[in-house]
Swiss-Prot record:
Subcellular location: Nucleus
Biased composition (Low complexity): 154-177
Protein name from the UniProt record: Protein G1-like2
Keywords of this entry: Developmental protein, DNA-binding, Nucleus, Transcription, Transcription regulation
Main location: nucleus
Residues in coiled coil: none
């Protein structure tokens, strides 16, 4: 029956608590060791009265159980990472082991009801001691301690932003997003185009302004010569021919003046008044 009961108990192992991790197991052992150190202390110490100085005593106490060779300053192998021969230098606790031990005890102290602000394993004196141990062992052993930093995986938002930026850089710009081209600069006026003179400084070629102001009409001139010839009793035929020729000459001058006005207006320049005199 007992054997059967033993078989039942072994078979019912599925209902047992899960096995603790390696970190949790080591933390329990470290906390038990520290509690034993407090009980063996003279005089015995209580956890509530423990300070950073007591933690330093505990760390120095653990050096006698260390397995790391730390060369002294006078040792011929000082600073040598791999000495070729043994030396009488003592064994110590490695800095990495002490740093991990303090971290586990600091967590265990708070798990057992300790206040975070009164945690002796987080005291400043303990941090300074660990820093001194790290520097001294690095020089004595010729090893540079460099804390490895974890590389955080990129978040989904940052990866999506990076992908969008890469897609925007590779894809051609859309016409709507592309800026409108600037308007072309105004073209210079060609050399053959003559600038227009200022307003009000050129002659207006209209026949009304020429007739009666600058030229004498042909009919008035003939009448004037006929009257003068009749009064003087001269040769009417001669004067009539002369006036007729003068009338014809006035018509030619009128045509020449009109042609000059048209040419001057096309050229865009002023016409001298001497043309009509």
């Amino acid at each position: 029956m007992q054997g059967g009961g033993g078989g039942d108990s072994s078979g019912g192992g599925g209902g047992e608590a899960p096995r603790p991790s390696r970190y949790e197991s080591q933390k329990r052992r470290d906390w038990h060791t520290f509690g034993q150190y407090l009980r063996n202390h003279r005089p015995p110490l209580e956890l509530s009265r423990c300070s950073g100085a007591h933690v330093l005593e505990f760390l120095r106490y653990l050096d006698q159980f260390g397995k790391t060779k730390v060369h002294a300053a006078g040792c011929p192998f000082f600073g040598h990472p791999s000495p070729p021969a043994p030396c009488p230098c003592p064994l110590r606790q490695a800095w990495g082991s002490l740093d991990a031990l303090v971290g586990r005890l600091r967590a265990a102290f708070e798990e057992h009801g300790g206040r975070p602000e009164a945690n002796p394993f987080g005291a400043r004196a303990v941090r300074l001691y660990l820093r001194e141990v790290r520097d001294s062992q690095a020089k004595a052993r010729g090893i540079a301690y460099e804390k490895k930093r974890r590389k955080r995986p990129p978040t989904s938002s940052s990866s999506s932003q990076a992908a969008a930026a890469a897609a925007a850089a590779t894809s051609p710009a859309s016409p709507a997003a592309s800026p409108t081209p600037p308007p072309p600069p105004p073209t210079e006026r060609s050399a053959d185009v003559r600038p227009m003179p200022p307003e009000g400084h050129f002659f207006i070629p209209h026949p009304h302004f020429m007739h009666g102001h600058f030229l004498v009409p042909g009919g008035d001139a003939d009448h004037h010569h006929q009257v003068s010839n009749a009064g003087n009793g001269g040769n009417t035929n001669t004067n009539t021919n002369t006036n007729t020729g003068g009338g014809g000459g006035n018509g030619d001058e009128m045509a020449v003046a009109m042609a000059a006005v048209a040419e001057a207006h096309a050229a865009g320049c002023m016409l001298p008044l001497s043309v009509f005199n």
